[in-house]
């Protein structure tokens, strides 16, 4: 069966045909490293990890680029607020610290490292080159107020709106720059002139004046720098479709680059039936999620829904994932013990070293726009059949089904017996630690409400000495283990 993917630009399922036979180039919008990672970031990264693993299983050589937006208004603003509160952290130090938090969270979930992970600040020259081309082609203009701002001229590009199928007249005003020198409210910033009071380290020289890049131009530059002017797949969260991806597509095509051939968008996360957002105060941070269950359980949960659907998080979600994974783990353990010492002990390896074959039904599900829920159904059917074979004493059938299960969990990155998960499998100890830490956090909150700040600070210090970091936010206090 041919792999088919849902292309957001055409709003249809399309047969996937690589630009270069046997090779695939994927660009995924990575995080803006302004604050700690949350469940939405993890869900998005995992969706494209599943895609990458499936393409690799099919024998394709995959190059995956996931960027880091380390220069942005939000990064600068968060650093400034920290300094106003008495901190000393510069914007670039904040960005690097948060970037490491993302890297640790991705690694904990078994998300494969990208082939390239460029920072925006390392591609300033490439961004300026695209802007120069746009100005020369009549699709961008420098503000005439000497601010140093450069804008994309949306009126000059008739195809603007093609990704989201919007008419220009119906689009909302671009909110990424000061509108004072725009020709049209929909014009968006390609280059932002330096403003009084901003750190000098957040500006670079340019033909239009000292400043920094706009958000959208960053991804156009980094994707084409590492994948070429035309590449296979551009991915990201559904919330990035407009304006970010719409603007990326317009400026790249207007600059003369064919750009991405397929556009994929993963769904968002709902918490207790509500869309997760900072404004609602219901953000679920990665550290809290990873502290509440084994990382392989979290991975199972995050990857269990179809990548385009909304992922529903509720109180029993991780317990359900734990139970499902336990069934797989129990069968793999049980079958390993029963088959030990028999002629069915080891699954035959492919003579050419290729990945173990998966059942046809599993492959058909994955080829159908990565239908992981259907693939998991095939996996659990195999587990049930394998247990039945063991009960009946049919070791040959049990061994065959065990090989199928092992191949499927390997493709999905959820093999509970893999070495990468063994270091985090001490669930009783984790539960005990979580209960103790949350009890101390509750005591600290009570002290703060009673304005006993000395006690609150002492509790925080005691936890810090034990290797526990507390992060306060409007939604409450969150904790993580130093180095994890």
Curated annotation (Swiss-Prot):
- Output the Gene Ontology cellular-component terms: cytosol
Kindly state what the record says about how the cofactor is bound: Binds 1 zinc ion per subunit.
Keyword line: Aminoacyl-tRNA synthetase, ATP-binding, Cytoplasm, Ligase, Metal-binding, Nucleotide-binding, Protein biosynthesis, Zinc
Q: Where in the cell is it found?
A: Cytoplasm
- InterPro entries, alphabetized: Cys-tRNA-ligase, Cys-tRNA-synt_Ia_DALR, Cys-tRNA/MSH_ligase, CysS_C, Rossmann-like_a/b/a_fold, tRNA-synt_1_cat_dom, tRNAsynth_Ia_anticodon-bd
Residue positions of motif 'KMSKS' region: 275-279
Reaction(s) catalysed by this chain's protein? tRNA(Cys) + L-cysteine + ATP = L-cysteinyl-tRNA(Cys) + AMP + diphosphate
Question: Which GO annotations describe the biological process of this protein?
Answer: cysteinyl-tRNA aminoacylation
Q: Which Pfam families match?
A: CysS_C, DALR_2, tRNA-synt_1e
Q: Which HAMAP family does its entry note?
A: Cys_tRNA_synth
**Per the similarity annotation, which family is this?**
Belongs to the class-I aminoacyl-tRNA synthetase family.
User: How does it associate, per the subunit comment?
Assistant: Monomer.
Name of the molecule in the record:
Cysteine--tRNA ligase
What is this protein's gene name?
cysS
